[in-house]
Amino acid sequence: FAKTAKFVACGFDRLDRLPLAAEDRKKVVGNPVRSPIKAVRDKPYPELSDTGPLNILVTGGSQGARLFGEVIPQAIASLPEAQRARLTVVQQAREEQLEAVRAAYRAAGVKHTVDSFFSDMQDRLAAAHLVIARSGAGTVTELAVAGRPAILIPLGIAMDDHQTANAEGMVTGAAADVVPEPKFTAEMLAPLLLERISNAGVLKARAKAAWQLGNPNAARDLADLAEQAAGVTGKRDA
């Protein structure tokens, strides 16, 4: 189909298996995002210093919450006490893990909100200084549009390792770190996390880099491209 399509719209610059003959018709338009996420883009990155309060948002979805519930509390518990005292962690966890994850944070003296679902995710994202997440296309797109730095853990069983490909732009754009799932342990995460939360300047720079990668108008751009392909002219509601 790509060989005969007038345009090939894609969410990210990397598009594997695209026929060479269609390469010059590839158009990177991004992925549409919900209005509440676009609204986060217009809000400033939360105030942050090297020693002040820092908010971490952990979202894993059904394919990531179990691993995150095991590794992340353990990694955070191993941080120096002064760093743990700064943190507020908002974490999505599986229902059967909720009490264990909460208990781990209580024992570590870390302020936390742990639940299996958050209906106000846009508000949680707006308050976050750093996000730890999988790298599904929707998640990566929302992080970029919102302008939030991240530590991304691609789903190991994802077909063709497409979650690593999704994260590529955030990594090359200096907006995120990527940790392969087999290497995602508390012993590996703790020093990386400590390095990130100890330097407010780096997190702010990464937030700006993520923001610059985001396209809040992907839905409009895709519609424009469809109309162009169809030869439609004239005004259309935004």
List each model region and its residues.
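Short loop/helix-cap segments at secondary-structure boundaries that form the rim of catalytic
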Residues: F1-A2, L15-E23, E99-A107, R124-L125, ...
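Active-site-proximal region of nucleotide-activated glycan assembly enzymes
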Residues: F1-D42
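Donor-nucleotide binding loops and adjacent catalytic segments primarily
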Residues: D42-V131, T164-E168, T172, V179-L189
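Short alpha-helical segment that forms part of, or immediately flanks, the ligand-binding pocket
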Residues: Q122, V140-R148, E168
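Acidic donor-binding loop of glycosyltransferase active sites
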Residues: A126-V140, R148-P149
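Short hydrophobic beta-strand element within catalytic cores of glycosyltransferases
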Residues: A133, P149-D160
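A short, well-ordered alpha-helix in the C-terminal region of glycosyltransferases
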Residues: V202-P216
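C-terminal alpha-helical cap of glycosyltransferases
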Residues: N215-A238
